[in-house]
C-alpha cells in the first residue's frame, strides 16, 4: 500500500494478490485486487472524495461431496484397470466415486469486478450544502464446466459455458440547510435519488460429447445441446423532503414527504 498527500489532497493506493491450493485435488483459488482512495479540497467551497476498487478472481475445481467421501469404502479398487472408468462403491454408496468426480471433471469460475464511488460536496452558503454522490458496480462472471464419461460406468460426458453481467448505477443529490436564529433552530433536507440495475445471463450446454479431449469447448461436439439467455432490469427514483424546527430545545416539530417510483 502507498499513501500520502498534503493539507488539500490525500490518497491511498493498495493492492493484494492471493494464489493458493485448496485442500482437495486439482483445485485452487486466485485473486488479484487493487484499490484507490482520493480525498481533495478542490476549492474552498468544493470537496471531492473518490473510491475505486477492482478485483479478478479465479476458482479452479469444484467442491467435493464430503458425505460421499466419508462413506465410501476406503479399500475398494478405485477404477477399472482396463477401461479407466471409476468404480462405484459396491457396499456403502450408490453415488458416483467422489475421487473420480473430481479427477475426471474440469470446472473454472471467474469474476471480474469493478466498484466506483464519487462524492462532491458544495458549500454553497453558510449552513447550505449540496452533496452529489454517484456510484457504479460492475461484475462479469463467466464459468465453464466439463465432466467425463469415465466418472462412472454408464455416465454421459457433458459440458457447459455460462456468463452473467451485472451493472448498477446510483445517483443521490442531497441539499441540506441548518441554522440557528436566537432560540429558533431550523434544518431542512431535500433528496433526489435515482438507481438502475441490469442483469444479463447466457448459457450453453451439451451432453454426449463425441470428443472429450476438447473439454468444455466446442458445443457443436455434443450430441444433445441446449441454450438459454435472460435479461432483467429494474430502476427506482425517490424524492424526500424533510423539515425540522426546534424552539428553545423543549419544543420540536418535524414534517417529511417521500415519493418513490
Per-region residue spans from a language model:
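Surface-exposed loop/interface segments of Gram-negative outer-membrane beta-barrel transport/assembly proteins
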Residues: 1, 22-29, 33-115, 131-238
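Long hydrophobic segments that form regular secondary structure
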Residues: 3, 121-126, 243
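Outer-membrane beta-barrel channels and translocator barrels
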Residues: 6-7, 43-47, 123-125, 180-182, ...
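Transmembrane beta-strand segments of Gram-negative outer membrane beta-barrel proteins
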Residues: 8-15
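Short, flexible loop/turn motifs enriched in small residues
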Residues: 9, 233-238, 245-249
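Transmembrane beta-strand segments that form the barrel wall of outer-membrane beta-barrel proteins
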Residues: 15-21, 253-261
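Exposed, low-structure sequence patches enriched in small/polar residues
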Residues: 242-246, 253-256
Amino acid at each position: 500500500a502507498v499513501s500520502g498527500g498534503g493539507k488539500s489532497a490525500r490518497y491511498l493506493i493498495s493492492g493484494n494478490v492471493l494464489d493458493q491450493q485448496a485442500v482437495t485435488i486439482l483445485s485452487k483459488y486466485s485473486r488479484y485486487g487493487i484499490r484507490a482512495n482520493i480525498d481533495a479540497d478542490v476549492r474552498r467551497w468544493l470537496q471531492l472524495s473518490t473510491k475505486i476498487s477492482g478485483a479478478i478472481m479465479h476458482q479452479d475445481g469444484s467442491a467435493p461431496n464430503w458425505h460421499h467421501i466419508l462413506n465410501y469404502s476406503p479399500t475398494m479398487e478405485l477404477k477399472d484397470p482396463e477401461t479407466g472408468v471409476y468404480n462405484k462403491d459396491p457396499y456403502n454408496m450408490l453415488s458416483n466415486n467422489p475421487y473420480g468426480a473430481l479427477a475426471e471433471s474440469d470446472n473454472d469460475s471467474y469474476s471480474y469486478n469493478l466498484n466506483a464511488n464519487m462524492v462532491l460536496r458544495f458549500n454553497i452558503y453558510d449552513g447550505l450544502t449540496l452533496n452529489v454522490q454517484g456510484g457504479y458496480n460492475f461484475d462479469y462472471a463467466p464459468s465453464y464446466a466439463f465432466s467425463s464419461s469415465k466418472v462412472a460406468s454408464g455416465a454421459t460426458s457433458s459440458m457447459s459455458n455460462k456468463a452473467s453481467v451485472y451493472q448498477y448505477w446510483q445517483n443521490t443529490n442531497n441539499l441540506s440547510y441548518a441554522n440557528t436564529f436566537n432560540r429558533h433552530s431550523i434544518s431542512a433536507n431535500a433528496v433526489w435519488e435515482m438507481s438502475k440495475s441490469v442483469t444479463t445471463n447466457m448459457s450453453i450446454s451439451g451432453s454426449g460429447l463425441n470428443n472429450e479431449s476438447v473439454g468444455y469447448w466446442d458445443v457443436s461436439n455434443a450430441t444433445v445441446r441446449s441454450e438459454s439467455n435472460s435479461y432483467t432490469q429494474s430502476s427506482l427514483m425517490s424524492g424526500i423532503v424533510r423539515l425540522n424546527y426546534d424552539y428553545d430545545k423543549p419544543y420540536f416539530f418535524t414534517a417529511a414527504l417521500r415519493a418513490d417510483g
